[in-house]
Amino acid sequence: MEKRRVVITGLGVVSPLGNKVSDMWQALLAGKSGVKPITRFDASSFPTQIAAEVRDFDPALVLDLKSIRKTDVFVQFAMESARQAWEDSGLEINETNAPRVGVAIGSGIGGMPWIEKNYDALLTSGPRKISPFFIPGAIINMASGMVSIKYDLKGPNISIVTACTTGLHNIGHAARMIAHNDADAMIAGGTEMASTPLGIGGFAAVRALSTRNDEPEKASRPWDKGRDGFVLGEGAACVVVEELEHAKKRNATIYAEIIGFGMSGDAYHMTRPDPEAEGFTTCMKNSLRDAGIAPERVDYINAHGTSTPAADPLEARAIKKTFGDHAYKLAVSSTKSMTGHMLGAAGALETVISVLAIRDNTAPPTINLENPDEGCDLDFVPNEAREMKIDTVMSNSFGFGGTNGTLVLSRVFD
């Protein structure tokens, strides 16, 4: 059976740079940072006191008060980004098509605030004070579950959990389900809210986070010699992915086509990437093979680019191994320099960003890149957005446990 073509017809975000797609995109193009001192708790005793928090979020936009009390924030973020994507797509559900439309939304960690809140209740007041909604409100697949319930989606209902690759993997697998005729459309993405005492403390304990507390907006600086770790972000992003002819029949706005999806595993270490960058390289090559295109077709890469000392130069090395001489003709940027690392939501948000780069023929910048590190000699679109012809974009996500994912997105040509 010939694979069906899959396109993106709806976008939605909740992010440190704004809770609408247009607000987030304009902030990115302006090179604004969403990193600020932590406000969710008193972080004065923590080595890291900064994060890229979501601000001015109102869960009542998408949930009633009763549902808000039953769910963790990561579910609420997912619900709002899914609402935006759904409304943007213009899809309508009826008894006939409901079994052909599904959901794939994951989270790297899940209900961290909900877990902390109920554990505190257990310690201070005993087991009877644990919420009856603790388990259903905290489990990762409840993001997909609540979205499917709200929109009566009776197709595939899954939540892939792969650390920092979660969002991209959910979108990639949703596209494959459509390509192989398991669904006609899916809401897919990722969500995260881990900027809590345990979340910040846990990442600080493995020395993954920046401690540039006196200059929050300059803390996330991918490929720069002065980088000292990533900045934790939070939020959610969803896209509606849909079979091409299905989208055309209802005159949907088609943003881009998903033409390639690659995966690989490092098989090296729990938290450190393979020092030869073989996993990263294999993943990118697999995505190009799946897309059936030459490396020279790619115009822009939205890189994983976390601002960690170990991973940044390895991703640059993998790009060179994948693209050869063309690597130096590519525009490559890390929008985590502005959004922070949104963990399970990162790959989903960066898919949205990649789509907008194609739509507007503009590569967002890598901010805070002042002194590129050794081996980091590609065109990283330093500090200012760039208008350029963009027809094909590659987006990378790599995660703890050596789990890697790459999407290739293209302008739709008929």
UniProtKB/Swiss-Prot annotation:
Superkingdom classification of source: Bacteria
GO biological process: fatty acid biosynthetic process
Active site: C164 (for beta-ketoacyl synthase activity), H304 (for beta-ketoacyl synthase activity), H341 (for beta-ketoacyl synthase activity)
EC code(s) of this entry: 2.3.1.179
Disulfide topology: none
Tagged with keyword Acyltransferase: yes
SUPFAM superfamilies xref list: Thiolase-like
Pathway involvement of the protein, from the record: Lipid metabolism; fatty acid biosynthesis
Sorted UniProt keywords: Acyltransferase, Fatty acid biosynthesis, Fatty acid metabolism, Lipid biosynthesis, Lipid metabolism, Transferase
Biological role: Involved in the type II fatty acid elongation cycle. Catalyzes the elongation of a wide range of acyl-ACP by the addition of two carbons from malonyl-ACP to an acyl acceptor. Can efficiently catalyze the conversion of palmitoleoyl-ACP (cis-hexadec-9-enoyl-ACP) to cis-vaccenoyl-ACP (cis-octadec-11-enoyl-ACP), an essential step in the thermal regulation of fatty acid composition.
PANTHER family linked: 3-OXOACYL-[ACYL-CARRIER-PROTEIN] SYNTHASE, MITOCHONDRIAL (PTHR11712:SF336), POLYKETIDE SYNTHASE-RELATED (PTHR11712)
Family named by the database record: Belongs to the thiolase-like superfamily. Beta-ketoacyl-ACP synthases family.
Name of the protein: 3-oxoacyl-[acyl-carrier-protein] synthase 2
Gene for this chain: fabF
